[in-house]
């Protein structure tokens, strides 16, 4: 967990939650939410969480472990929650969970999860250092940090293989 920074934010400081009711323009011919539409929303919320962490511009570099676990349908209330899990020199990993929230009792069921790699960039689009480190407060924060380190190694391995 080496971070050569003097300023830190906790994952909770940058946590972002966004909600939307699924409309007709969001569904495909099978009556389900378009996967691409959901990916677009997830990317936007991940970018907002990363921006909140670094207080700067970001761009998406990679998406890992995108898993569609359950469908979503017209009039479902979609909740997207993004939270930073790791901060490197110029990049951050953001976990994005997607839920459907019950109108009756507010319970949430997971429909999707993914990890986004966001790169801090200048106005010109060049990578630049992230000013804030990530202060790991909870046990879950530490578990996510170590999981991110493993995902980084997998990404490096895949990149070396030409993927």
Sequence positions of predicted segments:
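HotDog/MaoC-like acyl-thioester-processing domains
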Residues: 3-18, 73-74, 85-163
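Short coil/loop residues immediately preceding or within conserved phosphate-binding loops
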Residues: 17, 58, 63
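A short small-residue
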Residues: 21-27
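A conserved, well-ordered hydrophobic junction motif at loop->secondary-structure transitions
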Residues: 27-39
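Short histidine-centered beta-strand/loop micro-motifs
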Residues: 29-32, 51, 70-71, 108
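Active-site helix/loop of acyl-thioester processing domains in fatty-acid/polyketide metabolism
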Residues: 37-55
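Conserved interaction-surface patches within small, structured recognition/assembly domains
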Residues: 61-71, 77-85, 100
């Amino acid at each position: 967990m080496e971070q050569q920074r003097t300023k830190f934010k906790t994952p909770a400081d940058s946590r972002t939650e966004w909600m939307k009711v699924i409309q007709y323009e969001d569904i495909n011919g099978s009556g389900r939410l378009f996967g691409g539409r959901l990916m677009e929303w997830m990317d936007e919320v991940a970018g907002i969480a990363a921006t909140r962490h670094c207080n700067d511009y970001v761009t998406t570099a990679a998406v890992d472990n995108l898993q569609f676990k359950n469908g979503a349908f017209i009039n479902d209330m979609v909740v997207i929650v993004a939270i930073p899990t790791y901060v490197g020199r110029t990049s951050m990993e953001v976990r994005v969970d997607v839920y459907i929230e019950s109108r009756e009792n507010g319970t949430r069921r997971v429909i999707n999860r993914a990890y986004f790699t966001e790169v801090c960039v200048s106005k010109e689009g060049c990578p630049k250092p992230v000013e804030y480190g990530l202060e790991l407060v909870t046990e879950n924060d530490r578990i996510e940090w170590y999981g991110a380190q493993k995902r980084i190694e997998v990404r490096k391995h895949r990149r070396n293989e030409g993927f």
